[in-house]
């Protein structure tokens, strides 16, 4: 059963989400309704919605993370209705009966209150569910509440997710693969950020054969495919079939640290672990990643190509082959700070490190970037010095390419600044900012931190 403290934490976050909805004057009030309500409302209600303004029913369901079936059950007396003593006097003053919610989510009336949570109601029994194939006749399966959103309808085993648990540890506990866990709990997401604490996850479906259990807690059972390589569990989702070496990802580890340890490139790692994603956002902690495949020969660290230049590892993806100078990107570095340090242009930097992208969004921390190539003569590292154009206005540096020459007011962009924030501060429009600073683009995705932005002209 969800503790009252956790329940209220969940309610608080849900109330914020609902309060942010357009025109949301209807709000989750608390443990007592302010408006009249249906006399058949469940006595187990722990949170109410005071419906003071018309809102789509589906928006109400989404904001409160409930299903239509639960909503109808709670407001129409689907459970026992023994009165709760603390609400007796309140109920006597609200005798008007609200209409029942229909099967197509209609029937809500402005000025009424509706139950949107019954945290302690008895666990209902799910209807028997059967698999799509001929795997026998299943019996009645009880589904505990609350569950993760969108669990498999034919689930027959459940795990109550505890605070701090992740998809990898749960998969390991039950001897299932990451792919199976995701298929049965799709709302968890490939990066497991959608997994809810204090809610039940599906860890088996009808017809699934779980690993044999002992008197002790189940342990991950390595699998031995036809190639003879034992695969430990759980693995990252969708790793390659011909993997012959594995690494258990620790909490806080990134792709760059792993590739450096095993002398492989970032491109190889993401090819063998595609669910990790090009920016490593899908890497799971406490799950095994593939760090070698059959026939792979690991690179020595560092490498010395035919040009005689040692290349440290790991590098940014797809850096040029003729690089002769490298910089280890630190957390918080931007393309602007790096090019300023080495006296190179942004054009050169993105040419040598193409995966960084024009907006620098693809730059990886803790990986080496190329800051010079064979035959390139760098400019002396300049000291930022204000320039004085013919209009007499000094322009601070650094600035983004293409800024207008008649600017007379500048704003230094800090981390976290956005175009709307800057617009409000200087009372200018987005069209003005884009016209004066074309590099930021019409949707402001090209705005760079630690550079000066034009916010006024002559």
Swiss-Prot record:
It comes from the Eukaryota. Residues 210-232 are annotated as: Disordered. SUPFAM superfamilies: LysM domain (SSF54106). GO terms for cellular component: extracellular region. Residues 212-229 have a biased composition (Polar residues). Residues 157-203, 245-291, 325-371, 409-455 form the LysM domain. It is found in: Secreted. Keywords: Chitin-binding, Repeat, Secreted, Signal, Virulence. Residues 1-19 form the signal peptide. PROSITE patterns: LYSM. One of its GO terms (molecular function) is chitin binding. Its main location: secreted. The LysM domains bind chitin and potentially related carbohydrates, and might be involved in damping host defense. Might have a role in sequestration of chitin oligosaccharides (breakdown products of fungal cell walls that are released during invasion and act as triggers of host immunity) to dampen host defense. This is LysM domain-containing protein ARB_05157. The lineage of its organism: Eukaryota, Fungi, Dikarya, Ascomycota, Pezizomycotina.
């Amino acid at each position: 059963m969800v503790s009252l403290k956790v329940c209220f934490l969940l309610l608080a976050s849900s109330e914020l989400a609902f309060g942010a909805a357009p025109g949301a004057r209807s709000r989750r009030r608390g443990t007592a309704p302010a408006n009249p309500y249906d006399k058949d409302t469940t006595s187990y209600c722990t949170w109410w919605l005071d419906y003071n303004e018309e809102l789509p029913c589906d928006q109400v369901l989404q904001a409160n993370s409930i299903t239509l079936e639960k909503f109808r059950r709670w407001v129409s007396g689907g459970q026992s209705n023994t009165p709760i003593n603390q609400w007796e006097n309140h109920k006597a003053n609200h005798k008007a009966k609200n209409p029942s919610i229909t099967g197509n989510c209609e029937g809500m009336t402005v000025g009424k209150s509706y139950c949107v949570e019954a945290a302690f109601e008895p666990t209902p029994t799910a209807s028997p569910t059967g698999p799509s194939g001929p795997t026998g006749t299943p019996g009645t399966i009880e589904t505990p509440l609350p569950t993760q959103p969108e669990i498999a309808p034919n689930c027959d085993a459940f795990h109550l997710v505890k605070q701090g648990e992740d998809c990898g540890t749960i998969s390991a506990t039950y001897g299932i693969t990451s792919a199976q866990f995701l298929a049965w709990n799709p709302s968890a997401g490939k990066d497991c950020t959608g997994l809810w604490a204090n809610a039940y996850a599906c860890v088996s479906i009808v017809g699934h054969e779980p690993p044999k259990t002992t008197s002790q807690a189940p342990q991950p059972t390595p699998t031995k495919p036809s190639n003879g390589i034992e695969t430990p569990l759980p693995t990252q989702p969708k790793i390659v079939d011909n993997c012959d070496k594995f690494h258990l990802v620790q909490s806080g580890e990134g792709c760059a640290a792993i590739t450096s340890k095993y002398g492989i490139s970032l491109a190889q790692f993401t090819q063998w672990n595609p669910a990790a994603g090009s920016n490593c956002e899908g890497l799971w902690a406490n799950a095994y990643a593939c760090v070698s495949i059959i026939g792979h020969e690991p690179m020595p660290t560092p490498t010395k190509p035919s040009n005689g230049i040692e290349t440290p590892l790991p590098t940014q993806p797809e850096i040029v082959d003729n690089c002769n100078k490298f910089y280890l990107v630190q957390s918080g570095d931007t393309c602007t700070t790096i090019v300023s340090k080495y006296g190179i242009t942004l054009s050169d930097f993105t040419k040598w490190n193409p995966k960084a992208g024009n907006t620098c969004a693809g730059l990886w921390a803790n990986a080496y970037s190329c800051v010079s190539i064979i035959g390139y003569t760098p400019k002396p590292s300049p000291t930022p010095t204000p320039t004085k154009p013919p209009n007499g206005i000094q322009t601070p540096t650094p600035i983004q390419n293409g800024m207008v020459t008649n600017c007379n007011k500048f704003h230094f962009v800090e981390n976290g600044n956005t175009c709307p924030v800057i617009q409000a501060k200087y009372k200018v429009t987005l069209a003005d900012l884009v016209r004066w600073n074309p590099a930021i683009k019409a949707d402001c995705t090209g705005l760079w931190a630690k550079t000066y932005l034009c916010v006024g002209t002559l």
